[in-house]
């Protein structure tokens, strides 16, 4: 095979490894050309520059990458963006409205529930999902809901 033929095959493969996605994120529609192997987390952070969602373990163990898909917490490191086309994706960037922090953000800040802040976006998104289905959860329910997000500096104990 000639060098030109090899380059053509490589170029052809690269084209096939990209896809156009239409994603609804924080109430806005985004069209993005991205690699088919990228996770939702990678597309959010690398292609759309929504870096509030944190990159932790890539194994679904730490919970740092939690976002809401149609109101449900989902680990963005374990899902391909093609799987959530047509669904509403909410990241931490969409929690505040018109520059006004969401009441959960205010409560977290007032209670000192953040030290390094790495787990905070995931905890906030998970807490939001919990409060959508249970507006008055007891402390055990809150602990259980947040248990999927690990905090390395123990800010979760607050």
Segment roles from a protein language model:
Residues 1-7:
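Intrinsically disordered, low-complexity proline-rich regions
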Residues 13-158:
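Signature of N-terminal electron-transfer/Fe-S-associated modules in redox systems
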């Amino acid at each position: 095979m000639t060098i030109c033929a090899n380059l053509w095959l490589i170029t052809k493969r690269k084209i096939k490894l990209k896809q156009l996605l239409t994603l609804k994120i924080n109430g806005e529609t985004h069209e993005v050309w991205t690699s088919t192997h990228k996770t939702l987390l990678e597309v959010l952070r690398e292609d759309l520059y929504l870096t509030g969602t944190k990159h932790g373990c890539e194994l679904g163990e730490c919970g740092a990458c939690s976002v809401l898909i149609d109101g449900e917490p989902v680990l963005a490191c374990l899902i391909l963006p093609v799987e959530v086309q047509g669904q509403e994706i909410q990241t931490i960037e969409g929690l505040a409205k018109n520059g006004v922090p969401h009441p959960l953000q205010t409560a977290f800040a007032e209670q000192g529930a953040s030290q390094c802040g790495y787990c905070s976006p995931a905890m906030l998104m998970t807490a939001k999902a919990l409060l959508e289905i249970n507006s008055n959860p007891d402390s055990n329910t809150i602990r259980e809901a947040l248990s999927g997000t690990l905090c390395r500096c123990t800010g979760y104990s607050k």
